[in-house]
A protein has these predicted regions:
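Pocket-lining segment of extracytoplasmic ligand-binding domains
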Residues: 105, 128, 167-171, 175, ...
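Conserved C-terminal helix/tail region of periplasmic/extracytoplasmic solute-binding proteins
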Residues: 309-344
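Short, glycine-/small- and polar/acidic-enriched structural segments
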Residues: 31-176, 192-198, 213
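Secondary-structure end/capping motifs
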Residues: 238-318
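Short, solvent-exposed loop/beta-turn-alpha elements that line the ligand-binding surface or hinge
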Residues: 58-65, 218-221, 291-299
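Stable alpha-helical elements in mature extracytoplasmic
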Residues: 44, 53, 74, 78, ...
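Short, low-complexity disordered leader/linker segments with a strong preference
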Residues: 1-34, 339-344
Length: 344
C-alpha cells in the first residue's frame, strides 16, 4: 500500500490542508475489493493514521483489499464526499455527522464507533481579559468552519453565559476560519481567543504564548465527549458488510494498540507527517497534544445526543425538530431489516 501526497506548506498549516491522498481514482464507485477512507492529518485522528501506517488495517481486512486514503481539514467536506459516494468510511466530528445524517433523512450515514474523546480547548490571549465572562463584549473569538464541532461548542458556551454572537444581535464576534488562519491571526493579535482542536490548541500555547483557559471536556458530564467518530456510508455497509465488520474490528485493535504503545504511536504520527506532509511538529507539541485527548472506540452515545441538543438549540438542526433513530450502527441488526430501513 502506498500513500502519495503533494504539499507545500509551512509547519503551521502542514496538518490541516485539504489535500487528497489517493491510490487510484477517488471518483470511482467503490467495490468489495476497495475501501476509501477519509480522515484528517491531525492527532485526534491517530487511529486511522497509526492503524494504516503500521499495517493493522491492511492485515485485518486482507491484503487483497485496496485502501484509498483521502485527507481533509473540514468535516462538512467529508460529509459532502459521503453524499457523492466518493468516500466509504470516515473519521469526523459529531457536528458534521449529525448534520449529514439529518440532511440525508437518516439514510446515508451510520456511526460505527468512536475514535477520540476530548482534544479541544479554549485558548485566549494572555491580556485579553477572557478569563472573566464579564469581559467578552466586543471580543473576537475564532473557531473552525461554521457548524463544525468546535463552532457548536463555542456558540453553546456563549449562550450558556447569556451571550450572543454579533450576527444574532449580541456583542461577541465569532469568526469561522481555518485552523492555519486562526494560528496566523492569533500570532498577530487580531483575535482574542480560539476554540480549536489539538494540536492547534497546544501550538497556540507553546508557539504563541496563548493561555489554555480550559479543556472542553471540563464542560461535559464525566469530563468526556466524542470528538472524533468513525462513520460509514450506509449503502457501502449494505454491500460490503463483512469488509466493514473487519474494518471495525481492526479499528478497535488499533485503539488498544495505541493505548498500550503511546510512545510508538507518537513516533508513527510524527513519521506520518514527515513522510506524507513534508514536515512534522516538535515532539513537545505532539506529547502535550496527545495528553489532552483519549483514544477510544466508545462513541459515548450520550455525548452525541447531548451535542445534538446543543446544536439544535443554536438552530443548526433545522426548524422542525430532529430524529436520530438509527444513527448508531447495530451489528446484530440483520441485513433484511437494515435494507428495509435504508429504503424507508
Amino acid at each position: 500500500m502506498k500513500i502519495s501526497i503533494v504539499i507545500t506548506l509551512g509547519i503551521a498549516a502542514v496538518i490541516a490542508m485539504a489535500v487528497i491522498a489517493t491510490i487510484g481514482s477517488g471518483l470511482e464507485q467503490s467495490s468489495q475489493s476497495k475501501i476509501r477512507v477519509a480522515f484528517f492529518p491531525s492527532i485526534g485522528h491517530a487511529v486511522p493514521i497509526v492503524g494504516i501506517e503500521n499495517g493493522i488495517f491492511e492485515k485485518g481486512i486482507g491484503e487483497q483489499i485496496q485502501i484509498e486514503t483521502k485527507l481533509f481539514d473540514s468535516g462538512p467536506q467529508v460529509i459532502e464526499s459521503i453524499f457523492a459516494s466518493s468516500i466509504d468510511v470516515a473519521y469526523v466530528g459529531p457536528g458534521p455527522v449529525l448534520n449529514g445524517f439529518l440532511k440525508s433523512h437518516g439514510k446515508d450515514i451510520r456511526i460505527l464507533a468512536g475514535a477520540a474523546s476530548g482534544g479541544a480547548s479554549f485558548i485566549i490571549q494572555p491580556d485579553s481579559g477572557l478569563d472573566s465572562i464579564e469581559n467578552f463584549d466586543g471580543k473576537r473569538i475564532a473557531s473552525p468552519q461554521i457548524s463544525n464541532s468546535q463552532d457548536v461548542s463555542l456558540r453553546y458556551y456563549l449562550a450558556s453565559n447569556d451571550l450572543k454572537p454579533v450576527e444574532k444581535g449580541g456583542t461577541v464576534f465569532v469568526l469561522n476560519i481555518s485552523n492555519p488562519d486562526i494560528y496566523t491571526l492569533f500570532a498577530k493579535g487580531d483575535i482574542d481567543g480560539a476554540w480549536v482542536p489539538e494540536p492547534w490548541a497546544t501550538m497556540l500555547v507553546q508557539d504563541l504564548d496563548g493561555v489554555r483557559l480550559f479543556n472542553e471536556e471540563k464542560l461535559w458530564p464525566n469530563e468526556e465527549f466524542a470528538s472524533v467518530l468513525l462513520i460509514v456510508r450506509t449503502d457501502y455497509l449494505e454491500n460490503n458488510h463483512e469488509l466493514v465488520q473487519n474494518w471495525l474490528k481492526s479499528h478497535k485493535e488499533t485503539v488498544a494498540w495505541i493505548n498500550s504503545n503511546p510512545d510508538q504511536s507518537k513516533s508513527i504520527f510524527e513519521s506520518f507527517l514527515k513522510k506524507h506532509m513534508g514536515k512534522s511538529l516538535p515532539t513537545k507539541i505532539i506529547d502535550e497534544s496527545f495528553s489532552n485527548l483519549t483514544i477510544t472506540s466508545d462513541p459515548i452515545k450520550n455525548s452525541v445526543l447531548t451535542f445534538a441538543e446543543r446544536a439544535d438549540s443554536l438552530g443548526y438542526l433545522g426548524r422542525t425538530g430532529y430524529n436520530l433513530d438509527g444513527i448508531f450502527y447495530q451489528p446484530d441488526l440483520n441485513l433484511n431489516t437494515m435494507v428495509k430501513q435504508l429504503i424507508g
